[in-house]
């Protein structure tokens, strides 16, 4: 029987190369051109994207990136590299590559890196705990395009998601417990997930169900009463309805109703990024406190913590 050599491909969304309008424009153009992300008619979308959205949004988004930029790059890139390196140390006999759907390093460069290591089987782990067509589906599409250009393709194991994985839920629960121990138990734990258009869910994307699964399992692991855990959706874009309730509107409502202390976690983000460090930790903190809230803490993503890396190692082991 032929010996198989397995490699691991960690996939995530991507990030601009620099906190500048030019770099952000390049990144947003690639990201917002993907039909998995925006499936509007190209005849309508292209003029809007190129003539309005990119010129207006790029300078503003670049300033937001600059506010969270780290010495080694964007937070997503820094933490993703740390995850790759830590998993490679945990699995020293297994090549581990990092690829992004948009920007650098690309998914194609990650596949080529693994093939250069003479692997004949790749375990693809999209770092999106809850499946969505706009994230995991985009990785699948790009991987298929990459392999379509190869004369010889490796065996592929593709991990769809891990919304209810035991190690993942335990890692989240331990992170919440540590935050409660540090800041005191809040009146409410708010779990904020990235939103998608409601239409995508209506057409069959089971993302909201996967988010509810994670929320239910995490609340159970924490032994918290259902009324003390709330699920919301953030980062909506455009005019059509997205999954509700919206995070910012919910925080405003809670502050106005007299809820004093809230802690917020984003279980759908495997690594901290602009949407967690700026939108949730800063913007939404101001929303809650401005509406009358008293205490607000953001619970960081799992990033490259030992528990998270162990979870990844155990997850890919089942597919090797």
Curated annotation (Swiss-Prot):
Enzyme Commission number, as recorded: 4.98.1.1
Keyword terms: Cytoplasm, Heme biosynthesis, Iron, Lyase, Metal-binding, Porphyrin biosynthesis
Tagged with keyword Transferase: no
Superkingdom of the source species: Bacteria
Main location: cytoplasm
Gene Ontology process terms (BP): heme biosynthetic process
Catalyses which reaction(s): heme b + 2 H(+) = protoporphyrin IX + Fe(2+)
Protein's cellular compartments: Cytoplasm
GO CC field: cytoplasm
One Pfam family recorded for the sequence: Ferrochelatase
InterPro entries noted in UniProt: Ferrochelatase, Ferrochelatase_AS, Ferrochelatase_C, Ferrochelatase_N
Binding site for Fe cation: 194, 275
Described function: Catalyzes the ferrous insertion into protoporphyrin IX.
UniProt record similarity statement: Belongs to the ferrochelatase family.
UniProt cross-references to PANTHER family, sorted A to Z: FERROCHELATASE, FERROCHELATASE, MITOCHONDRIAL
Protein name stated in the entry: Ferrochelatase
Species per Swiss-Prot/TrEMBL record: Escherichia coli O6:H1 (strain CFT073 / ATCC 700928 / UPEC)
Gene: hemH
């Amino acid at each position: 029987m032929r010996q198989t050599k397995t490699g691991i491909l960690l996939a995530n969304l991507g990030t601009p190369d620099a906190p500048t309008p030019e770099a952000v424009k390049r990144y947003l153009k690639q990201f917002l051109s993907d039909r998995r992300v925006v499936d509007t008619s190209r005849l309508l979308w292209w003029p809007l994207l190129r003539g309005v959205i990119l010129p207006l949004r790029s300078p503003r988004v670049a300033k937001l990136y600059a506010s969270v930029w780290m010495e080694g790059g964007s937070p997503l890139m820094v933490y993703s590299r740390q995850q790759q390196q830590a998993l490679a140390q945990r699995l020293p006999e297994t090549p581990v590559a990092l690829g992004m759907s948009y920007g650098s390093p690309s998914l194609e460069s990650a596949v080529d890196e693994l093939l250069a290591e003479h692997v004949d089987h790749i375990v693809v782990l999209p770092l999106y705990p809850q499946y969505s067509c706009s994230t995991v589906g985009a990785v699948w599409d790009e991987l298929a395009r990459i392999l379509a250009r190869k004369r010889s393709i490796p065996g592929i194991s593709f991990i769809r998601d891990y919304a209810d994985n035991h190690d993942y839920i335990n890692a989240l629960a331990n992170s919440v417990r540590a935050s409660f121990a540090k800041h005191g138990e809040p009146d409410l734990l708010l779990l904020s997930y990235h939103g998608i258009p409601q239409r995508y869910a209506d057409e069959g994307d089971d993302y909201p169900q996967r988010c509810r699964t994670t929320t239910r399992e995490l609340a159970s692991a924490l032994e918290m009463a259902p009324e003390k855990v709330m699920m919301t959706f953030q980062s909506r874009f455009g005019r059509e309805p997205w999954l509700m309730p919206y995070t910012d509107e919910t925080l405003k409502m809670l502050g106005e109703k007299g809820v004093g202390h809230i802690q917020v976690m984003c279980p759908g983000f495997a690594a901290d990024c602009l949407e967690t460090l700026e939108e949730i930790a800063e913007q939404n903190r101001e929303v809650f406190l401005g509406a009358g809230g008293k205490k607000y803490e953001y619970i960081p993503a799992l990033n490259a913590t030992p528990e998270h890396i162990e979870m990844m190692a155990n997850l890919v082991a089942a597919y090797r």
